[in-house]
Amino acid sequence: MALPNQQTVDYPSFKLVIVGDGGTGKTTFVKRHLTGEFEKKYEPTIGVEVHPLDFFTNCGKIRFYCWDTAGQEKFGGLRDGYYIHGQCAIIMFDVTSRLTYKNVPTWHRDLCRVCENIPIVLCGNKVDVKNRQVKAKQVTFHRKKNLQYYEVSAKSNYNFEKPFLYLARKLAGDGNLHFVETPALAPPDVTIDLAAQQQHEAELAAAAAQPLPDDDDDLIE
């Protein structure tokens, strides 16, 4: 979904909207993809930066036009123009901030009000940071709404490709689609404790086997 002033491409392209509280790392995440950062365009009428992120799959090249809010969400909700024609989405929160997770349902509601039945990935960012406040087992919203969830670290590139691969498979209707080439990413700014993160992922898997809690606040006080 290209903007009027953007060049169209002769391979599949999709509008991907990225939402979440300010400071959760949405811009940092998108900017890891170097060609997308180099070719980004600013759309002044809506106040967004659009990053064209290309990925190479076994079925050919695809492009996500990633819409980044440029921080407007700090001043209230986003305008409908940001969401209109969105074909897929990422909702991001910060695992070091309980409030950003508490606000995920609001972002999900706003998104679904305009974009019905699109594939959505929930991402818990900043898993490289030691003082994690939202534990893996406390993340249950995706199970209630049938979303995919990934733990990511924008600054270390950990799991960078997973949300895009999931969305590409959903949009193509092909569960066997896979990336055949790694996109050029910015060098990691931090290193992640892989042993600790594997423990978090194990907790996540164990929690998925448990019944959902009855409360709506997902255990976050």
From Swiss-Prot:
TM stretches of this protein: none
Cellular compartment(s): Nucleus
Positions of the UniProt region annotated as Switch-II: 71-87
Binding positions for GTP per the UniProt entry: 21-28, 71, 125-128, 153-155
Entry superkingdom: Eukaryota
Entry annotated with the keyword Nucleus: yes
Coarse class of the protein's main subcellular location: nucleus
Single annotated GO MF: GTPase activity
GO biological process, one term: ribosomal subunit export from nucleus
Domain Small GTPase Ran-type residue range list: 10-174
GO CC annotation terms, alphabetical: cytoplasm; nucleus
Region of interest (Switch-I), ranges: 40-48
Keywords, comma-separated and alphabetical: GTP-binding, Nucleotide-binding, Nucleus, Protein transport, Transport
A Pfam family annotated for this UniProt entry: Ras
PANTHER family named in the record: GTP-BINDING NUCLEAR PROTEIN RAN-1 (PTHR24071:SF33), RAN GTPASE (PTHR24071)
Assembly, per entry: Found in a nuclear export complex with RanGTP, exportin and pre-miRNA.
Function: GTP-binding protein involved in nucleocytoplasmic transport. Required for the import of protein into the nucleus and also for RNA export. Involved in chromatin condensation and control of cell cycle.
NCBIfam families the record matches: small_GTP (TIGR00231)
Family: Belongs to the small GTPase superfamily. Ran family.
Protein name from the UniProt record: GTP-binding nuclear protein Ran-1
Source organism (scientific name): Oryza sativa subsp. indica
